[in-house]
């Protein structure tokens, strides 16, 4: 139930299957799989879409779920997952600090039996925000900030009110628009700490950045300077969000 800038999510479930039409609209729809699986013991979803960057496999997500005890059957474009005996916590080491795979493990492990220790986890601000939310609903999640996430499974979760952190990718996109048009733009409710990997890039191109609390004013020159080198890296490397390229 959506009201203006708020969304109310009720705890009723009408099924454990999400249609291909819905899954194809958004890459992050993949996160419904661990959420439904951990609650209902089974889930059927199709491969997610919604990303124009190119092929982005979900093998890390599925491998992690299998380690937690899920049985995953792939049939064409769909995946059917079951956990007959429930999910069980275990140590998991990601070969790459994938944001989606990290979130997948956190959601699945929240009500799994025992403790899950996720190593080489993503360090994006959204990981900390998800941990804050899960803890608010009764979970036991610890993010150490250095790539390790520890989740102690609980028997049940509860409702809560949570404010999502400002979207750093949207903010960076607006900043890019201001830069290429030689304009001036005031962004409100920005967490500049989350933008730390990209702010030096805008400054190197000649943009003037002024911060005032949660406000960020960017003023672009008539002609941008070329930056010497730009490489995408896992957060908090520079530049750490591939979407911004």
Regions found by a protein language model. Give the residues of each.
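Structural preference for solvent-exposed beta-strand-turn elements
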Residues: 3-245
């Amino acid at each position: 139930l959506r009201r203006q800038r708020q969304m109310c999510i009720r705890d009723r479930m009408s099924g454990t299957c999400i249609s291909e039409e819905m899954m194809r609209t958004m890459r992050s729809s993949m996160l419904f799989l661990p959420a439904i699986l951990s609650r209902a013991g089974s889930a059927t979803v199709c491969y997610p879409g919604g990303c124009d960057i190119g092929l982005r496999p979900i093998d890390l997500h599925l491998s992690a779920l299998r380690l937690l005890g899920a049985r995953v059957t792939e049939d064409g474009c769909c995946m059917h997952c079951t956990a007959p005996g429930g999910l069980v916590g275990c140590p998991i080491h990601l070969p790459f600090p994938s944001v989606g795979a990290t979130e997948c493990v956190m959601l699945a492990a929240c009500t799994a039996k025992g403790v899950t220790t996720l190593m080489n986890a993503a360090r994006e601000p959204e990981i900390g925000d998800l941990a804050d939310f899960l803890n608010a609903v009764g979970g036991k999640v610890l993010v150490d900030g250095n790539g390790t996430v520890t989740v102690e499974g609980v028997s049940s979760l509860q409702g809560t009110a949570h404010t999502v952190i400002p979207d750093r990718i949207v903010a960076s996109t607006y900043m890019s628009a201001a830069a290429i048009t030689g304009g001036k733009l005031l962004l409100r409710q920005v967490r500049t700490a989350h933008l730390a990997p990209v702010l030096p890039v805008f400054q190197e191109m000649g943009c003037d950045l002024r911060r005032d609390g949660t406000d960020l004013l960017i003023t672009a020159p008539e002609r941008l300077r070329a930056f010497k080198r730009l490489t995408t890296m896992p957060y908090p490397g520079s530049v750490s969000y591939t979407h911004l390229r």
